[in-house]
Protein backbone atom coordinates (compact mmCIF):
# COMPACT_ATOMS: atom_id res chain seq x y z
CA UNK A 1 0.00 0.00 0.00
CA UNK A 2 1.55 3.22 1.15
CA UNK A 3 4.93 4.07 2.75
CA UNK A 4 6.25 5.72 6.00
CA UNK A 5 6.02 9.47 6.26
CA UNK A 6 9.09 11.07 4.80
CA UNK A 7 9.68 14.58 3.54
CA UNK A 8 7.26 17.18 2.26
CA UNK A 9 7.20 18.46 -1.29
CA UNK A 10 5.80 21.97 -1.19
CA UNK A 11 4.01 23.60 -4.10
CA UNK A 12 6.17 26.50 -5.34
CA UNK A 13 5.17 29.84 -3.86
CA UNK A 14 4.61 31.23 -7.33
CA UNK A 15 2.00 28.54 -7.93
CA UNK A 16 0.16 28.14 -4.62
CA UNK A 17 -1.38 30.75 -2.35
CA UNK A 18 -3.32 30.24 0.86
CA UNK A 19 -7.06 30.41 0.37
CA UNK A 20 -8.64 33.26 2.29
CA UNK A 21 -11.71 31.24 3.18
CA UNK A 22 -12.94 27.69 3.62
CA UNK A 23 -11.38 24.83 5.58
CA UNK A 24 -8.29 25.76 7.59
CA UNK A 25 -5.06 25.07 5.73
CA UNK A 26 -6.65 24.64 2.29
CA UNK A 27 -4.50 26.14 -0.44
CA UNK A 28 -5.25 27.07 -4.02
CA UNK A 29 -3.01 27.45 -7.05
CA UNK A 30 -2.65 30.72 -8.91
CA UNK A 31 -5.28 29.53 -11.39
CA UNK A 32 -7.76 28.64 -8.64
CA UNK A 33 -7.29 24.89 -8.28
CA UNK A 34 -7.67 23.35 -4.82
CA UNK A 35 -4.44 21.76 -3.55
CA UNK A 36 -4.93 18.23 -2.19
CA UNK A 37 -2.19 17.04 0.17
CA UNK A 38 -1.57 13.31 0.16
CA UNK A 39 0.82 10.51 1.10
CA UNK A 40 2.03 8.12 -1.57
CA UNK A 41 3.90 4.86 -1.98
CA UNK A 42 7.52 4.68 -3.04
CA UNK A 43 8.31 2.89 -6.28
CA UNK A 44 4.67 2.71 -7.33
CA UNK A 45 2.04 5.00 -8.80
CA UNK A 46 -1.30 5.49 -7.06
CA UNK A 47 -4.50 5.78 -9.12
CA UNK A 48 -4.84 9.48 -8.27
CA UNK A 49 -1.25 10.18 -9.33
CA UNK A 50 -2.06 8.40 -12.58
CA UNK A 51 -5.21 10.51 -12.92
CA UNK A 52 -3.15 13.68 -12.64
CA UNK A 53 -0.74 12.44 -15.31
CA UNK A 54 -3.60 11.47 -17.62
CA UNK A 55 -5.03 14.98 -17.30
CA UNK A 56 -8.23 13.86 -15.60
CA UNK A 57 -8.24 16.60 -12.94
CA UNK A 58 -9.61 20.03 -13.84
CA UNK A 59 -10.18 21.65 -10.44
CA UNK A 60 -7.52 20.12 -8.17
CA UNK A 61 -3.73 19.89 -7.86
CA UNK A 62 -1.99 17.11 -5.91
CA UNK A 63 0.74 17.89 -3.37
CA UNK A 64 2.90 15.00 -2.13
CA UNK A 65 3.53 14.88 1.65
CA UNK A 66 5.82 11.86 1.82
CA UNK A 67 5.04 8.14 1.89
CA UNK A 68 3.43 5.77 4.40
CA UNK A 69 2.89 2.03 4.91
CA UNK A 70 0.06 2.44 7.43
CA UNK A 71 -3.49 2.85 6.22
CA UNK A 72 -4.87 3.67 9.71
CA UNK A 73 -2.22 6.37 10.14
CA UNK A 74 -2.99 7.71 6.66
CA UNK A 75 -6.71 8.18 7.29
CA UNK A 76 -6.02 9.54 10.78
CA UNK A 77 -3.81 12.19 9.14
CA UNK A 78 -6.72 13.06 6.85
CA UNK A 79 -9.15 13.21 9.79
CA UNK A 80 -6.84 15.60 11.67
CA UNK A 81 -6.33 17.92 8.66
CA UNK A 82 -2.72 17.00 8.01
CA UNK A 83 -3.90 15.75 4.61
CA UNK A 84 -7.01 16.36 2.53
CA UNK A 85 -7.65 12.65 1.95
CA UNK A 86 -6.36 9.21 2.89
CA UNK A 87 -6.88 5.55 2.13
CA UNK A 88 -7.14 2.50 4.37
CA UNK A 89 -8.68 -0.91 4.81
CA UNK A 90 -12.44 -0.61 5.24
CA UNK A 91 -12.36 -2.16 8.71
CA UNK A 92 -10.05 0.65 9.83
CA UNK A 93 -12.33 3.20 8.16
CA UNK A 94 -15.35 1.79 10.02
CA UNK A 95 -13.49 2.00 13.36
CA UNK A 96 -12.40 5.58 12.68
CA UNK A 97 -15.91 6.74 11.83
CA UNK A 98 -17.54 4.75 14.64
CA UNK A 99 -15.07 6.43 16.99
CA UNK A 100 -16.42 9.83 16.03
CA UNK A 101 -14.07 11.00 13.29
CA UNK A 102 -16.07 13.02 10.74
CA UNK A 103 -14.90 11.44 7.48
CA UNK A 104 -16.70 9.75 4.58
CA UNK A 105 -15.56 7.12 2.07
CA UNK A 106 -15.92 8.33 -1.51
CA UNK A 107 -14.21 5.71 -3.72
CA UNK A 108 -12.72 2.23 -3.43
CA UNK A 109 -8.92 2.37 -3.28
CA UNK A 110 -7.70 -1.23 -3.38
CA UNK A 111 -8.89 -4.81 -3.36
CA UNK A 112 -8.28 -8.31 -4.65
CA UNK A 113 -8.92 -9.39 -8.22
CA UNK A 114 -7.91 -12.52 -10.09
CA UNK A 115 -4.28 -11.40 -10.45
CA UNK A 116 -3.57 -9.16 -7.45
CA UNK A 117 -4.23 -10.18 -3.85
CA UNK A 118 -2.61 -10.66 -0.43
CA UNK A 119 -1.19 -14.08 0.40
CA UNK A 120 -0.23 -15.41 3.82
CA UNK A 121 2.82 -17.63 3.35
CA UNK A 122 4.61 -20.32 5.35
CA UNK A 123 7.92 -22.06 4.71
CA UNK A 124 7.68 -25.39 2.90
CA UNK A 125 9.51 -27.05 5.82
CA UNK A 126 7.48 -25.34 8.57
CA UNK A 127 5.06 -28.17 9.20
CA UNK A 128 2.24 -25.63 9.35
CA UNK A 129 -0.78 -26.91 7.44
CA UNK A 130 -3.88 -25.73 9.30
CA UNK A 131 -5.17 -22.77 11.27
CA UNK A 132 -4.74 -24.73 14.48
CA UNK A 133 -1.01 -24.97 13.77
CA UNK A 134 -0.78 -21.20 14.21
CA UNK A 135 -1.73 -21.27 17.90
CA UNK A 136 1.32 -19.96 19.75
CA UNK A 137 3.01 -18.87 16.52
CA UNK A 138 3.70 -15.50 14.87
CA UNK A 139 2.18 -13.81 11.83
CA UNK A 140 4.08 -10.90 10.27
CA UNK A 141 1.85 -7.96 9.25
CA UNK A 142 2.53 -4.42 8.05
CA UNK A 143 0.45 -2.69 10.73
CA UNK A 144 -2.12 -3.52 13.39
CA UNK A 145 -5.81 -2.76 13.03
CA UNK A 146 -5.81 -3.06 9.26
CA UNK A 147 -6.19 -5.50 6.37
CA UNK A 148 -3.67 -8.15 7.40
CA UNK A 149 -4.97 -8.40 10.96
CA UNK A 150 -8.64 -8.52 9.98
CA UNK A 151 -8.11 -11.14 7.26
CA UNK A 152 -6.00 -13.30 9.57
CA UNK A 153 -8.47 -13.19 12.45
CA UNK A 154 -11.42 -13.82 10.13
CA UNK A 155 -9.68 -16.84 8.55
CA UNK A 156 -8.85 -18.27 11.97
CA UNK A 157 -12.48 -17.78 13.03
CA UNK A 158 -13.80 -19.46 9.89
CA UNK A 159 -11.43 -22.37 10.47
CA UNK A 160 -13.10 -23.00 13.81
CA UNK A 161 -10.69 -21.50 16.34
CA UNK A 162 -12.20 -20.05 19.51
CA UNK A 163 -11.62 -16.44 20.55
CA UNK A 164 -9.18 -17.65 23.20
CA UNK A 165 -7.23 -19.69 20.65
CA UNK A 166 -7.16 -16.80 18.17
CA UNK A 167 -5.76 -14.56 20.91
CA UNK A 168 -2.77 -16.92 21.14
CA UNK A 169 -1.81 -16.22 17.51
CA UNK A 170 0.70 -13.37 17.79
CA UNK A 171 0.74 -10.56 15.22
CA UNK A 172 4.18 -9.04 14.65
CA UNK A 173 4.50 -5.67 12.89
CA UNK A 174 7.24 -5.60 10.25
CA UNK A 175 8.13 -3.33 7.33
CA UNK A 176 6.90 -4.98 4.10
CA UNK A 177 10.46 -5.06 2.75
CA UNK A 178 11.62 -7.14 5.76
CA UNK A 179 8.73 -9.59 6.06
CA UNK A 180 10.01 -12.26 3.67
CA UNK A 181 13.43 -12.36 5.35
CA UNK A 182 11.79 -12.64 8.76
CA UNK A 183 9.84 -15.66 7.51
CA UNK A 184 12.86 -17.37 5.99
CA UNK A 185 15.00 -16.83 9.09
CA UNK A 186 12.33 -18.12 11.48
CA UNK A 187 11.55 -14.83 13.21
CA UNK A 188 7.91 -15.30 12.18
CA UNK A 189 5.89 -18.33 11.08
CA UNK A 190 3.54 -16.69 8.57
CA UNK A 191 4.24 -13.71 6.31
CA UNK A 192 1.58 -11.45 4.83
CA UNK A 193 2.85 -10.57 1.35
CA UNK A 194 1.37 -8.65 -1.54
CA UNK A 195 2.41 -6.94 -4.74
CA UNK A 196 6.10 -6.97 -5.55
CA UNK A 197 6.97 -8.56 -2.19
CA UNK A 198 4.71 -11.52 -2.95
CA UNK A 199 6.00 -11.95 -6.50
CA UNK A 200 9.70 -11.82 -5.60
CA UNK A 201 9.26 -14.12 -2.60
CA UNK A 202 7.41 -16.74 -4.64
CA UNK A 203 10.08 -16.56 -7.35
CA UNK A 204 12.76 -17.47 -4.79
CA UNK A 205 10.83 -20.60 -3.82
CA UNK A 206 10.66 -22.52 -0.56
CA UNK A 207 7.36 -21.02 0.57
CA UNK A 208 3.66 -21.54 -0.16
CA UNK A 209 0.35 -19.94 0.74
CA UNK A 210 -1.60 -21.02 3.79
CA UNK A 211 -4.51 -18.66 3.05
CA UNK A 212 -5.30 -15.58 0.93
CA UNK A 213 -7.80 -12.75 1.10
CA UNK A 214 -9.03 -13.73 -2.38
CA UNK A 215 -9.83 -17.27 -1.28
CA UNK A 216 -11.59 -15.98 1.82
CA UNK A 217 -13.85 -13.38 0.21
CA UNK A 218 -13.31 -13.73 -3.53
CA UNK A 219 -12.73 -10.73 -5.76
CA UNK A 220 -13.58 -7.84 -3.47
CA UNK A 221 -12.79 -4.18 -2.81
CA UNK A 222 -11.12 -3.91 0.60
CA UNK A 223 -10.25 -0.24 1.06
CA UNK A 224 -11.58 3.24 0.37
CA UNK A 225 -10.44 6.85 0.04
CA UNK A 226 -11.86 9.16 2.70
CA UNK A 227 -12.28 12.93 2.96
CA UNK A 228 -13.29 14.98 5.99
CA UNK A 229 -16.97 15.86 6.02
CA UNK A 230 -16.29 19.59 6.42
CA UNK A 231 -14.01 19.50 3.38
CA UNK A 232 -16.69 17.71 1.35
CA UNK A 233 -19.25 20.32 2.37
CA UNK A 234 -17.04 23.33 1.68
CA UNK A 235 -15.21 22.00 -1.39
CA UNK A 236 -17.63 19.60 -3.05
CA UNK A 237 -16.35 20.53 -6.51
CA UNK A 238 -12.80 19.57 -5.53
CA UNK A 239 -13.92 16.25 -4.04
CA UNK A 240 -16.01 15.58 -7.12
CA UNK A 241 -13.04 16.35 -9.35
CA UNK A 242 -10.79 14.01 -7.37
CA UNK A 243 -13.32 11.17 -7.41
CA UNK A 244 -14.23 11.42 -11.08
CA UNK A 245 -10.58 11.64 -12.12
CA UNK A 246 -9.39 8.82 -9.88
CA UNK A 247 -12.34 6.58 -10.81
CA UNK A 248 -11.53 7.12 -14.48
CA UNK A 249 -7.84 6.38 -13.85
CA UNK A 250 -8.79 3.13 -12.11
CA UNK A 251 -10.98 2.26 -15.07
CA UNK A 252 -8.03 3.07 -17.36
CA UNK A 253 -5.96 0.55 -15.39
CA UNK A 254 -8.73 -2.02 -15.67
CA UNK A 255 -9.01 -1.84 -19.47
CA UNK A 256 -5.48 -0.92 -20.61
CA UNK A 257 -2.90 -3.56 -21.62
CA UNK A 258 -0.34 -4.26 -18.90
CA UNK A 259 2.68 -3.18 -20.97
CA UNK A 260 1.15 0.25 -21.52
CA UNK A 261 0.37 0.61 -17.81
CA UNK A 262 3.93 -0.29 -16.78
CA UNK A 263 5.41 2.12 -19.34
CA UNK A 264 3.19 4.93 -18.08
CA UNK A 265 4.07 4.20 -14.46
CA UNK A 266 7.79 4.25 -15.29
CA UNK A 267 7.43 7.61 -17.02
CA UNK A 268 5.54 9.09 -14.05
CA UNK A 269 8.13 7.84 -11.55
CA UNK A 270 11.01 9.24 -13.62
CA UNK A 271 9.30 12.62 -13.99
CA UNK A 272 8.62 13.09 -10.27
CA UNK A 273 12.32 12.71 -9.44
CA UNK A 274 12.20 10.96 -6.05
CA UNK A 275 15.11 8.58 -6.72
CA UNK A 276 12.86 5.50 -6.79
CA UNK A 277 13.50 2.01 -8.14
CA UNK A 278 11.42 1.43 -11.28
CA UNK A 279 12.71 -2.14 -11.50
CA UNK A 280 9.84 -3.21 -9.25
CA UNK A 281 7.29 -2.28 -11.90
CA UNK A 282 7.95 -5.51 -13.80
CA UNK A 283 6.01 -7.28 -11.05
CA UNK A 284 2.86 -5.21 -11.64
CA UNK A 285 -0.09 -7.41 -12.60
CA UNK A 286 -3.33 -5.45 -12.25
CA UNK A 287 -5.13 -2.66 -10.43
CA UNK A 288 -6.38 -5.12 -7.80
CA UNK A 289 -9.78 -3.42 -7.92
CA UNK A 290 -12.42 -5.71 -9.46
CA UNK A 291 -15.35 -3.28 -9.61
CA UNK A 292 -15.49 -1.02 -12.71
CA UNK A 293 -14.64 2.54 -11.71
CA UNK A 294 -14.14 1.54 -8.05
CA UNK A 295 -17.80 2.07 -7.12
CA UNK A 296 -18.36 1.27 -3.43
CA UNK A 297 -20.90 -1.41 -2.44
CA UNK A 298 -22.66 -1.76 0.93
CA UNK A 299 -21.29 -5.26 1.47
CA UNK A 300 -17.67 -4.04 1.30
CA UNK A 301 -18.21 -2.05 4.50
CA UNK A 302 -21.02 -3.97 6.18
CA UNK A 303 -18.92 -7.13 6.39
CA UNK A 304 -16.40 -5.30 8.62
CA UNK A 305 -19.11 -3.62 10.68
CA UNK A 306 -20.46 -7.10 11.41
CA UNK A 307 -16.93 -8.35 12.17
CA UNK A 308 -16.32 -5.55 14.69
CA UNK A 309 -19.69 -6.21 16.35
CA UNK A 310 -18.96 -9.93 16.58
CA UNK A 311 -15.57 -9.18 18.14
CA UNK A 312 -17.09 -6.77 20.68
CA UNK A 313 -15.28 -3.76 19.20
CA UNK A 314 -18.45 -2.00 18.03
CA UNK A 315 -22.00 -1.75 19.39
CA UNK A 316 -24.61 -3.30 17.11
CA UNK A 317 -26.59 -0.65 15.26
CA UNK A 318 -24.17 2.19 15.99
CA UNK A 319 -23.29 2.58 12.30
CA UNK A 320 -24.46 1.08 9.03
CA UNK A 321 -22.64 0.92 5.71
CA UNK A 322 -24.76 3.74 4.30
CA UNK A 323 -23.58 6.01 7.12
CA UNK A 324 -20.00 5.62 5.97
CA UNK A 325 -19.79 6.16 2.22
CA UNK A 326 -21.18 7.97 -0.80
CA UNK A 327 -20.99 7.20 -4.53
CA UNK A 328 -22.54 10.51 -5.55
CA UNK A 329 -19.29 11.83 -7.02
CA UNK A 330 -18.42 8.68 -8.98
CA UNK A 331 -19.28 8.97 -12.70
CA UNK A 332 -19.76 5.20 -12.92
CA UNK A 333 -22.45 5.36 -10.22
CA UNK A 334 -24.17 8.74 -10.65
CA UNK A 335 -25.30 8.35 -14.26
CA UNK A 336 -22.52 10.35 -15.91
CA UNK A 337 -21.10 7.22 -17.55
CA UNK A 338 -22.54 3.75 -18.17
CA UNK A 339 -21.36 1.52 -15.27
CA UNK A 340 -19.03 -0.63 -17.39
CA UNK A 341 -17.85 2.01 -19.86
CA UNK A 342 -14.26 3.11 -20.40
CA UNK A 343 -12.33 5.98 -18.78
CA UNK A 344 -14.11 8.51 -20.97
CA UNK A 345 -17.52 6.90 -20.89
CA UNK A 346 -16.90 5.06 -24.15
CA UNK A 347 -17.96 1.51 -24.85
CA UNK A 348 -15.26 -1.01 -23.94
CA UNK A 349 -14.53 -3.86 -26.34
CA UNK A 350 -14.90 -7.28 -24.74
Protein language model regions, located:
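Short, low-complexity disordered leader/linker segments with a strong preference
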Residues: 1-35, 340-350
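Short, glycine-/small- and polar/acidic-enriched structural segments
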Residues: 27-163, 168-173, 189-195, 219
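Short, solvent-exposed loop/beta-turn-alpha elements that line the ligand-binding surface or hinge
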Residues: 59, 112-113, 215-217, 287-296
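Soluble non-cytosolic domains of exported or imported proteins
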Residues: 68-72, 87, 142-147, 177, ...
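Pocket-lining segment of extracytoplasmic ligand-binding domains
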Residues: 91, 126, 177-270
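Secondary-structure end/capping motifs
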Residues: 233-316
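Conserved C-terminal helix/tail region of periplasmic/extracytoplasmic solute-binding proteins
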Residues: 305-350
Amino acid sequence: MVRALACTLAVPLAVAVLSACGTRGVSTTADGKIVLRYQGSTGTVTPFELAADLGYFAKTRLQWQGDTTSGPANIQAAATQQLEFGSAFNGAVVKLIAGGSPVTSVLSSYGADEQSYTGYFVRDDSGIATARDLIGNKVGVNTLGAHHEFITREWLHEQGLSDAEIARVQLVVLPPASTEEALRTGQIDVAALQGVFLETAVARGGIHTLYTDKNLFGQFDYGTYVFRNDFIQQHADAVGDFVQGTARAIRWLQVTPRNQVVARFADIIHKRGRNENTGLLKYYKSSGIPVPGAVIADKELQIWIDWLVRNHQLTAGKVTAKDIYTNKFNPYANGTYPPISGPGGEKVAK
